[in-house]
């Protein structure tokens, strides 16, 4: 079945629409913390001193039947280590030059109960009993390349590493990307090439950029693909996934530019889309895909300050979005936790009425459908109705129909359902 998502504005004919407003469907949060920073826990994981943004990469490995999470963190941070939780509300966070980043790993059999296994790979304070995969790396992106034929290369990784050889004789002449972001990497389904979504700076603003590679070793220079609106809405990071042939992005949007604003120095999660990877726009301008929790640091909810998400994991009729939520402002003290929310498949945006007392009219550009079958994804209230008309190029109505009867599962604010259009007599009934 060919689907057309209202998310794609190219589907619509704006010259023949009225009283219609595009709305963003919100992700329903679990509100359950699956795991968190364990520096102050008992027993303590001393290397989990500050997750900061976390930049989670969540993968369900269908062959191994396991969920994997790869997340960035600070394994050394003197100010976080030296300031007890109860004292942080009284003190300004001061990051020092000695901070060291790393990459850690967690896993789960069901996506709900997570463990941090002792990997025995990286030495930390005299032993290897930890879940650290790498130290001195930042903003790591990990993906499972299901088209890779070599089983040892199925999991691929891109990261930022600062390295000095120590001799003082070798000058690095290669690229030096800023890349202090979630360096999100995937294989483009259209071209087979690898794509890296990273970040650059232009005119003092954070901007999403794209690099490409055919071999995962040699990469093109970063090219701007998406910027926000001034200082107030900057693209901090943007994981990308493909849905129904459309590129979807979940940008974390950083707010600065006005210290008097309530959202100053916080990070919201938005939804963006593109049909070609080069030109992006927000699905619904200024609306958050995952709402931050209520309150402020240190008493607020665990995700009241900053949100950074992973590309979704599909399961049944839903998409699950795992994310790192911080309870403080971006540059301040904050404790970060790992959680998730879900969205019904196909339900990214929906049209409703601007004026509830009047009907809304949506008109598409011409498209083909074969046979007599046409279905509409509907979530309508008790007092609502939907009608369908087929027009010619002059806008004259030729055929009328209505979606079939609503079921008990379809409720206002509940599940949406695909309803087959029942045409008027004489057309395929």
Can you say where each PLM-predicted feature lies in the sequence?
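Carbohydrate-active catalytic/glycan-binding domains of CAZyme proteins
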Residues: 1-429
């Amino acid at each position: 079945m060919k689907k057309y998502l209202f998310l794609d504005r190219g589907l619509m004919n704006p010259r023949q629409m009225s009283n219609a407003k595009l709305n963003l469907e919100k992700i329903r949060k679990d509100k359950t913390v699956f795991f968190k920073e364990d520096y102050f826990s008992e027993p303590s994981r001393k290397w989990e001193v500050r997750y900061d943004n976390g930049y989670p990469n969540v993968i369900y490995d269908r062959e191994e039947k396991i969920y994997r999470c790869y997340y960035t963190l600070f394994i050394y941070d003197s100010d976080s280590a030296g300031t007890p939780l109860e004292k942080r509300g009284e003190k300004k966070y001061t990051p020092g030059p000695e901070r060291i980043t790393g990459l850690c790993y967690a896993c789960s059999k069901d996506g709900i109960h997570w463990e941090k296994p002792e990997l025995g790979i990286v030495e930390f304070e005299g032993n290897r009993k930890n879940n650290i995969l790498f130290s001195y790396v930042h903003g790591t992106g990990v993906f499972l390349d299901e088209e890779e034929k070599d089983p040892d290369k199925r999991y691929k990784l891109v990261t930022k590493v600062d390295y000095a050889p120590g001799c003082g004789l070798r000058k690095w002449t290669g690229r030096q990307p800023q890349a202090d972001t979630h360096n999100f990497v995937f294989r483009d389904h259209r071209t087979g090439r690898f794509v890296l979504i990273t970040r650059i700076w232009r005119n003092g603003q954070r901007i999403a950029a794209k690099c490409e590679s055919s071999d995962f070793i040699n990469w093109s220079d970063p090219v701007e693909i998406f910027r926000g609106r001034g200082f107030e809405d900057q693209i901090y990071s943007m994981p990308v996934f493909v849905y129904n042939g459309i590129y979807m992005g979940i940008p974390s949007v950083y707010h600065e530019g006005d210290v008097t604003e309530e959202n100053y120095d916080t990070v919201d999660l938005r939804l963006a889309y593109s049909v070609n990877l080069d030109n992006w726009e927000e699905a619904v301008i200024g609306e958050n895909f995952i709402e931050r929790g209520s309150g402020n640091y240190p008493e607020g909810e665990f995700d009241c300050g900053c949100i950074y998400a992973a590309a979704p994991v599909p399961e049944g009729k839903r998409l699950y979005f795992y994310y790192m939520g911080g309870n403080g402002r971006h540059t301040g003290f904050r404790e970060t936790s790992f959680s998730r929310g879900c969205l019904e498949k196909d339900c990214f945006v929906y049209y409703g009425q601007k004026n509830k007392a009047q009907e809304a009219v949506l008109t598409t550009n011409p498209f083909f459908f074969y046979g007599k079958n046409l279905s509409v994804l509907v979530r309508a209230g008790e007092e609502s109705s939907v009608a369908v008309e087929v027009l010619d190029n002059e806008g004259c109505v030729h055929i009328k129909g209505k979606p079939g009867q609503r079921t008990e599962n379809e409720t206002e604010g509940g599940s949406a359902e695909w309803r087959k259009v029942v045409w008027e007599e004489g057309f395929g009934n």
